[in-house]
């Protein structure tokens, strides 16, 4: 798809305040518009954008906690250069995860715009082993993208994207510490966790910026 906006109802039935998740037309009129800042993220394709990348941008731009409150944050990961109906743009995109989502909430931004196929890393989506469909798509080598990722980065790195692998490797307690706030509101922790952290706190999203 082209550039589009996400509202809470896209990924959840209830927001963190316990109220029914809102549709786009129920969001404030200024939720998607306002003063914006662009972070140029130093990340390779298929990389996971974390709070560490975002903290590095804050330092580089001379920003401090609180400076982004109420603003729109645009992420330039370089993925826009690959825009196409292709594996390079979809299967192997850089993207965010739970740590970035919590960071956005902490900083109080009102909208996050991503220059890639989704806010979340592709392995956090149904392209990998998440969601009702769990497609685990074939990659460029003819193997699944899960197999490819494990071969390149190892099982522990992959576990970040897979609830059952995370629990197997790190244990239930570690999983609950990292993803428990999502599970507590009835959503699957490793399935688009950045979306859910943001949108569940009323922070809207833009994809394919």
Go through each PLM region and give its residues.
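Active-/binding-site microenvironments in catalytic and ligand-binding cores
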Residues: 1-209
């Amino acid at each position: 798809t082209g550039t589009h906006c996400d509202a809470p109802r896209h990924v959840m039935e209830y927001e963190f305040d316990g109220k029914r998740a809102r549709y786009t037309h129920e969001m404030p009129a200024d939720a998607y518009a306002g003063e914006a800042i662009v972070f140029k993220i130093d990340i390779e394709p298929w990389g996971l954008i974390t709070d560490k990348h975002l903290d590095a941008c804050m330092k580089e731009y001379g920003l401090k906690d609180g400076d982004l409150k109420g603003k729109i944050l645009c992420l330039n990961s370089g993925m826009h250069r690959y825009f196409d109906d292709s594996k390079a743009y979809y299967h192997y995109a850089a993207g965010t995860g739970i740590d970035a989502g919590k960071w956005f909430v902490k900083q109080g931004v009102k909208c996050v715009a991503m220059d890639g196929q989704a806010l979340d890393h592709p392995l956090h989506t149904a392209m990998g082993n998440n969601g009702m469909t769990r497609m685990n798509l074939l990659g460029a080598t003819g193997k699944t993208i899960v197999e490819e990722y494990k071969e390149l980065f190892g099982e522990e790195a992959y576990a970040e994207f897979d609830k059952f692998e995370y629990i197997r490797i790190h244990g239930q307690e570690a999983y609950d510490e990292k993803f428990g706030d999502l599970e507590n509101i009835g959503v699957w922790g490793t399935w688009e966790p950045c979306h859910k952290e943001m949108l569940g706190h009323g922070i809207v999203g833009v994809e394919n910026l």
